[in-house]
Amino acid sequence: MTEGLHLGELRRCFRGAVPAVIATATADGTPNITYLSSVHLVDNERIALSNQFFSKTSRNLAENPRASLLVIDPLTYDEYRLEVVFERTERRGALFESLRSELEAVACMSGMQEVFRLKAADVYRVVHIEPVLGAAARRGDPPPDVPPALDPATAADRMSELATRLARATDLDVVVETSVVGLAELLDYEHAFLALRDESGERLYVIASHGYDSQGVGSELSMDDGPVGLAARRCSPIRLGAMQQMARYGRVVRSSYEHRSSSGDEEIPLPGLDVRSLVAVPAMASGELVGVLVVESTHEVAFDETDEQILTVAATLIAAAIENERLREEVAVPAPETVSPEPGTRGGTPTSVRVFERDASVFVDGEYLIKGVAGRILRALLQAHEASGRVDFTNRELRLDPSLELPEYRANLESRLILLKRRLDEREVPFRIHKTGRGRFRLDVDADIRLELVSGSDG
């Protein structure tokens, strides 16, 4: 190996941003060149290559185990030629699973999941590294502006502070807000959102975000699509860099999340950003998926292994705090009976609220607000207020209300109430939800409401 140059110094080259190239040859010297979708750093002396359609390459290596790779730094475009010797093939185990996750992440960006299927992980020993002057250096461009990484000691101190803040949180709403704000204030992750698993176990919904023009609270993601869904489905972190080269992430993949079908279903847009790098980390508690913590950046290849480790710890802390608050809400003491004011007339044009019974989609003055469990909860609250002027409610009575069709999924109610509260605040509608105690909340109505229920046949 080249003296003074180690594989660890080439880490950016192995993040899948720029395709690498491998050259092999038959025993008689006939060459074959193939592009690589993924090169994985194994240790200081070895790399692993994804083998999904390497028939010619595999045949050549059986005859001649030596090969040459060209890898490129996605920021400086410096090139490095690696002379390697084939050592072994792995078809299971930790290395295989890690490489499969990387390959699936690349595939989901281009919609080629059925094509990019890992057959094996081929491990090579690197015997020589030859640096080649990059395009930026040849043009005389200044070095790229690479965001500095947190040093381990600082990261540990700030993670300790995040844990302290989460421990002091008084309810689930504070937990999710502390999570995304703490990532920005303590760990310098300016763009982040937290998505929780829904009751079906097949979708995620955004409950909190930070650093975006639009909060995107209530937007949904399928666990079958995209890097965030992949992180949830595999319960393992997904890290992507130079995403615009992969699939114009901000336009292509995000639009697939937000696609509106011909049935007329409404969706809330995800938090928007011109994304170039992403880390999606599963938030796990007691061996179960609670949600996914997502951090994004407008910088190319902004995140590395250290960021992934930091965010994995953060996601674990957040998941534990969420589950703890959910358990506390389940055993909360019911609120005492309260006397609600008689319904009055406020004057002016009433606010129109239409609820479509098919999926509980709610429209306020013609603008889409929310649907599903949160939509049914809002319908029940507005019906009670319309009938008797009630404004004070408890979580317990909602759990016992069969008309809400609440799912079996444990502690889903509190999450949906927070989702509804945040969505009402974001849209600035004339009725809001405010917590008045553990397991209690109030519906504040500042306008006359004209509630209309629309059956499936009418919609």
Regions found by a protein language model. Give the residues of each.
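Helix-loop-beta substructure at the N-terminus of cytosolic sensory domains
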Residues: 169-207, 215, 325
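Short boundary/linker motifs that mark transitions into or out of structured domains
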Residues: 329-375, 379, 431-434, 438-440, ...
